[in-house]
């Protein structure tokens, strides 16, 4: 099936950018950059390129929130095609770790989200059965996954009228990782009552009922997951595994190989007098081997993935990329963030696992259960489109062509940029804030330190300006509530340090003030300045004031680039008779889980809004877990559960005090 785009017709710079990208990719350019200004509709451009080329596509986003937003947009643009969402399936994740200085072992603790797990299986099923597939993914796409050849080869084909003895069918379901549960039928499970089998594919939302007559399949139908009502008749179906890590045939041979590595490593420790490490490794690994023999799996089975997938030591693991056909296309959204993220994933994972191996918690082969190195990622992709308003050095150095998308479909211009002296800057700033407040507009102010932000906010409030500080410790709910209050006019000015994070594209903001603009560094680099300037690009009166005693090189380049874009936009509007208008964007209510900071419920949200809030909290929880701030991660997990309960219309679960209890062994 071909891709069928059902979105708005391209406008502004979109047609030119689409044609440029398609031409470059058809000419065989391996790396191409789409340099698209904020608000120019880069998603529509990506969609039209995918439609024109007709190739499966992977769109990588830097975090779960942006991935969810992109997936929703692509589903609207391609309602007849397979748009899949592939992120980590953990609601709560605490990686296995060891802190030698404290002799503290932290066992892996995780809570899997069954809906996200279903979406992951839906992704791999789609990739193996059709070509009209767009996968929107997070960095989870470069982490280990099962062997796609095994996943494809082990599927089960059931057809009406064909012989299939009941016991053979049950045995095959167990081989594919499906669990029997005659009470609770959910994705990845099946139940059997007499000659009726009900199977819930791991990637579907509705189970399949198979009715046997003796050894023959008499009837196949799809049924309602709750009522059991027959929805439609099926001539047959293909069932893919319920797990990406299948126990291969010849399991005993694999276990012998693991045991061989174990005794070599035990001997290594004993020769160095590290008896404790040897004993620890022996106990843990023998326990895992026994679990694998009896149950076919064990906690942390992914650490033995090298043996199960037949990979050689040091060889890259199978990942989602291996499920794509060879000619697939990759888009790296917000590439100035995504590229460094891809470059850094391997090193962080290796450092944590190396400690576990060195102290006898894991075999050296566990190091092969890892994300891809950046160079390995590039080896697996044939063509990449970098998408960003401010492409990084890697993108610009390697791209055979840079395609610009400067003109917005709305006709809005990049904001006016003015450099102002630091003398009396606060008084000048207050005058600007008051002027905009009188017109019903808002102001964003960015400073360099927490102390400066706190002192400036206090000073503004003391002088009658309704200002708030966007504190770095605010969680997702408080942050969204603060932005909502700004948009509703409860206050007129928001002071912050890093205004580059998502969620700050506020149409009511007509002034962005950057203090200490000439202090070069991460938040005052050319790329950061252009991104911050873009925060005023959704208002027709948008202005940016740079307070500085001198014009730094970064400032000069950012101003020149903004002025260049603005000149192009003005010329286009003049030629086409377009009058820019401020973006109209609905102000969404913010909801908090019950008992959260004793805050009252503000308003009921739609299911889509609730899911967006949950995605934001999941991102914060991951970040807390990666920073080893497990108390905060546990609190965020409880908040997520409360929101999910509200989404499902049930009573919120009780929070787990202090997180889950952890066992040692």
UniProtKB/Swiss-Prot annotation:
SMART domains: DEXDc, HELICc. Residues 23-408 form the Helicase ATP-binding domain. GO terms for molecular function: ATP binding; ATP hydrolysis activity; DNA binding; excinuclease ABC activity. SUPFAM superfamilies: C-terminal UvrC-binding domain of UvrB, P-loop containing nucleoside triphosphate hydrolases. Residues 425-591 form the Helicase C-terminal domain. A motif (Beta-hairpin) lies at residues 89-112. Transmembrane segments: none annotated. Residues 611-646 form the UVR domain. ATP binds at residues 36-43. GO terms for biological process: nucleotide-excision repair; SOS response. Forms a heterotetramer with UvrA during the search for lesions. Interacts with UvrC in an incision complex. The beta-hairpin motif is involved in DNA binding. NCBIfam families: PRK05298.1, uvrb. The UvrABC repair system catalyzes the recognition and processing of DNA lesions. A damage recognition complex composed of 2 UvrA and 2 UvrB subunits scans DNA for abnormalities. Upon binding of the UvrA(2)B(2) complex to a putative damaged site, the DNA wraps around one UvrB monomer. DNA wrap is dependent on ATP binding by UvrB and probably causes local melting of the DNA helix, facilitating insertion of UvrB beta-hairpin between the DNA strands. Then UvrB probes one DNA strand for the presence of a lesion. HAMAP family: UvrB. PANTHER family: UVRABC SYSTEM PROTEIN B. The ATPase activity is stimulated by single-stranded DNA. UvrB is stable up to 80 Celsius degrees. This is UvrABC system protein B. The gene is uvrB.
């Amino acid at each position: 099936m071909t891709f069928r785009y059902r979105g708005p017709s391209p406008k502004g710079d979109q047609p030119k950018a689409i044609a440029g990208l398609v031409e470059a990719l058809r000419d065989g350019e391996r790396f191409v950059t789409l340099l698209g200004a904020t608000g120019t509709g880069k998603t529509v451009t990506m969609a039209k390129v995918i439609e024109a080329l007709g190739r499966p596509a992977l769109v990588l986003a830097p975090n779960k929130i942006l991935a969810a937003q992109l997936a929703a947009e692509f589903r609207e643009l391609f309602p007849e095609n397979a748009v899949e969402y592939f992120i980590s399936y953990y609601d709560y994740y605490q990686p296995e770790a060891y802190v030698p200085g404290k002799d503290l072992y932290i066992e892996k603790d995780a809570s899997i989200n069954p809906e996200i797990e279903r979406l992951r299986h839906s992704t791999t099923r789609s990739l193996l059965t059709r070509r009209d597939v767009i996968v929107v993914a997070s960095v989870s796409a470069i982490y280990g996954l099962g062997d796609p050849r095994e996943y494809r080869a082990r599927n089960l084909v059931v057809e009406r009228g064909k012989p299939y003895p009941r016991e053979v069918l049950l045995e095959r379901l167990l081989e594919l990782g499906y669990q029997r549960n005659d009470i609770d039928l959910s994705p990845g499970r099946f139940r059997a009552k007499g000659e009726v089998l009900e199977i819930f594919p791991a990637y579907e939302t509705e189970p399949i009922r198979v009715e046997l007559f003796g050894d023959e399949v008499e009837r196949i139908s799809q049924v309602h997951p709750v009522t059991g009502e027959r929805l439609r008749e099926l001539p047959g179906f293909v069932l893919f595994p319920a797990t990406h890590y299948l126990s291969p045939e010849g399991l005993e041979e694999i276990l012998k190989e693991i045991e061989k590595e174990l005794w070599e490593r035990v001997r290594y420790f004993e020769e160095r007098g590290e008896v404790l490490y040897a004993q620890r490794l022996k106990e843990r690994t023998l326990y895992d081997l026994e679990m694998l023999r009896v149950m076919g799996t064990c906690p942390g089975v992914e650490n033995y993935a090298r043996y199960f997938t037949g990979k050689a030591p040091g060889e890259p693991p199978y990942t989602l990329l291996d499920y794509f056909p060879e000619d697939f296309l990759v888009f790296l959204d917000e590439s100035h963030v995504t590229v460094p993220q891809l470059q850094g994933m391997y090193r962080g994972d290796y450092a944590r696992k190396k400690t576990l191996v060195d102290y006898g918690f894991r075999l050296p082969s566990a190091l092969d259960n890892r994300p891809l190195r950046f160079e390995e990622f590039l080896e697996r992709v044939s063509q990449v489109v970098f998408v960003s308003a401010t492409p990084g050095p890697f993108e610009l150095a390697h791209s055979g062509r840079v395609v610009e998308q400067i003109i917005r479909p709305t006709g809005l211009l990049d904001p006016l940029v003015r450099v102002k002296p630091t003398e009396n800057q606060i008084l000048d700033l207050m005058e600007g804030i008051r002027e905009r407040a009188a017109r019903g507009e808002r102001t964003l102010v960015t400073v360099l330190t927490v102390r400066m932000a706190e002192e400036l906010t206090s000073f503004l409030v003391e002088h009658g300006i309704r200002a708030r500080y966007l504190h770095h410790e605010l969680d997702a709910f408080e942050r969204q509530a603060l932005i909502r209050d700004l948009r509703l006019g409860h206050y007129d000015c928001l002071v912050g340090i890093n205004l580059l994070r998502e969620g700050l594209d506020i149409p009511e903001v007509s002034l962005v003030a950057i203090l200490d603009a000439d202090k070069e560094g991460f938040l005052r680099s050319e790329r950061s300045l252009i991104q911050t300037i873009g925060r005023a690009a959704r208002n027709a009166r948008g202005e940016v004031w740079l307070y500085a005693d001198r014009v730094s090189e970064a400032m000069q380049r950012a101003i020149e680039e903004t002025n260049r874009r603005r000149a192009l936009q003005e010329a286009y509007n003049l030629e086409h008779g377009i009058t820019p208008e401020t973006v109209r964007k609905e102000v969404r209510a913010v909801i908090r889980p019950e008992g959260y900071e004793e805050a009252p419920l503000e308003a009921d949200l739609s299911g889509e809004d609730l899911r967006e809030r949950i995605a934001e909290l999941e991102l914060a929880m991951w970040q807390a877990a990666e920073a080893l701030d497990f108390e905060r991660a546990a609190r965020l997990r409880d908040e997520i559960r409360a929101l999910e309960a509200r989404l499902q219309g049930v009573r919120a679960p009780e929070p787990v005090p202090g997180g889950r209890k952890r066992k040692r062994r």
